[in-house]
Amino acid sequence: MRGLFLLLFFPILSFGQLTKSGFRHTNPTLYVDWSGKIGSGKGLERFGKKTISFVCGNTLTIAHVTSGGVAPENKTVTYSTVKSSLSGSEKCWITQNLGSTSQAISETDATEAAAGWYWQFNKKKGYKNNGTTTFPTFPSTNSNTETSNWGASTDPCTLELGSGWRIPTVTEWTNVNNANLRAQAYAGALKMHAAGYISIGTSSALTDRGSKFFYWSSTYSDVTYAKGLVIYTNTTYNQISNNDKDAGLSVRCIRD
């Protein structure tokens, strides 16, 4: 009877809903339990499950943890994804900023939930700002002087979402910018919005949240600056610009 009970009960366990603190996956694999329910399966054994490859257009649930030195807080986020050719060829994009709790509800959404986290160029550590305070403490000196593009070992998209995810190159952002961006920034597929930036210096103030977009590319300019996409909501200004590498800008993630 004991064996019969286990046989009848075991197939309906929702393995995909279990999580284990401190474990992460590093590949875009979803897990399907025997009841047909899909879950992330991060940190779980594959016993009793089959795997399927991630399909763009589906949601991607990530358990962000601070122990990896990237996320500034522990939280689980379900990211929406979309296929788009705005970058010049078809890619998969998340439709919200990395670290955001939810997709923005407008291009001027000034909430912390929509803003997500901020990064200095070519650094893996993310920072959050609740509107008044940045955590962890933002560096107050200009020390980011390396002359290299953002690499996979420090790319927060790769480290947090898994292999294949990355920060867009300046060429990809340029193509996005040239595709009627001012009209399509939020209204289009990518749902981009004005999360502002964290300024450099001793104040490290949150600036322009709700009025300006600042997105890093993976491409550096020189010892001081790196390329990024900037959009102003109150004008027709949108362009690829040089941004101080020590400033904290938003990150969007793309997958080939």
Residue ranges and their predicted role:
Residues M1-K20:
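Bacterial Sec-dependent N-terminal signal peptides
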Residues Q17-S67, K75, R252-D256:
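Enriched but not universal
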Residues T26, D33-S35, V55, A63, ...:
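A structural detector for beta-sheet-dominated domains
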Residues G43-A113:
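GGW-centered surface loops in extracellular recognition modules
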Residues T81-V82, T95-I105, A110-D155, L159-D256:
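C-terminal, surface-exposed recognition/capping segments
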